[in-house]
């Protein structure tokens, strides 16, 4: 009897839903994208067991390393549903790199984690290309990452992203709350849109209100609603880093989850309070649209969305003009939005009647 007829079936990884060759093809496709992010200290070649970075080659003398990691939240679900994958990588880098600059740190290198049920190289390449673009905007090298193909873990077409960024700052240049003082001025840098927070509410509104995402936005007929919502998060690193090195910036707050109310207090000492005047900048039309569609109260706006301010910059009154001019010279839109005063650590946002669709003068407060 031929023994081969009695032998058990031979299983392969591919039969289980994982294609090693597809993964290898992806690495070959994205390697040039990573190499394009090279910077002093990193060669950004992929394929090894780990990535190297030379702090001395990057020009640091007595640095502290600063690390951050984040994701894109449920904005990713909207990207998957709409087939718009070419901006979420910028979002991913922005959420990490902007968190580093608020410590005074220069982003140095980035790693990503891409997980999916079945690898689609066209989608994955588009995502990694946008991560590489984000790294260029932040001035950091894409030195590695992980692509995980996990059958049964995700629905068809779904994927998840996580980013990890490491930066460095000279020991004597770390931004802490120690420099913030009563009388300091709060400048706001304009956001590029919703950024990457509040999308669970955005998606709920889209479903409940029956938005036609592929149609021109009601507030701007020149742009599709989906494009307005998916605008990548602005990366502020290159605009802020030179000013951080001058010592003129006392503190920075990245306006993410928790909005203005909860993020500004994170950079204040226990004895100081931030006062923000919502009348000092015009509410972006996209934010006004979201508020009107959801009948959202001003306080809820101030703790859910960035409301048009992606980064808060705290400076001394004497440096307001110089810092504003320097930021505007590199393309930032700058508003004087508030001040720091003595009081319990926290933030109060106030507005007059009609500001943010209010029916009367209003005030929203959060104590940290």
Swiss-Prot record:
Its main location: cytoplasm. GO terms for molecular function: ATP binding; phosphoribosylamine-glycine ligase activity; phosphoribosylformylglycinamidine cyclo-ligase activity. The keyword Transmembrane helix does not apply. InterPro entries: PurM-like_C_dom, PurM-like_C_sf, PurM-like_N, PurM-like_N_sf, PurM_cligase. It is an enzyme of class 6 (ligase). Coiled coil: none annotated. Pathway: Purine metabolism; IMP biosynthesis via de novo pathway; 5-amino-1-(5-phospho-D-ribosyl)imidazole from N(2)-formyl-N(1)-(5-phospho-D-ribosyl)glycinamide: step 2/2. It is found in: Cytoplasm. Keywords: ATP-binding, Cytoplasm, Ligase, Nucleotide-binding, Purine biosynthesis. Gene3D superfamilies: PurM-like C-terminal domain (3.90.650.10), PurM-like, N-terminal domain (3.30.1330.10). GO terms for biological process: 'de novo' IMP biosynthetic process; adenine biosynthetic process. It holds the Pfam family AIRS. One of its GO terms (cellular component) is cytosol. It catalyses: 2-formamido-N(1)-(5-O-phospho-beta-D-ribosyl)acetamidine + ATP = 5-amino-1-(5-phospho-beta-D-ribosyl)imidazole + ADP + phosphate + H(+). It comes from the Bacteria. Belongs to the AIR synthase family. This is Phosphoribosylformylglycinamidine cyclo-ligase. It comes from Sphingopyxis alaskensis (strain DSM 13593 / LMG 18877 / RB2256). The lineage of its organism: Bacteria, Pseudomonadati, Pseudomonadota, Alphaproteobacteria, Sphingomonadales. The gene is purM.
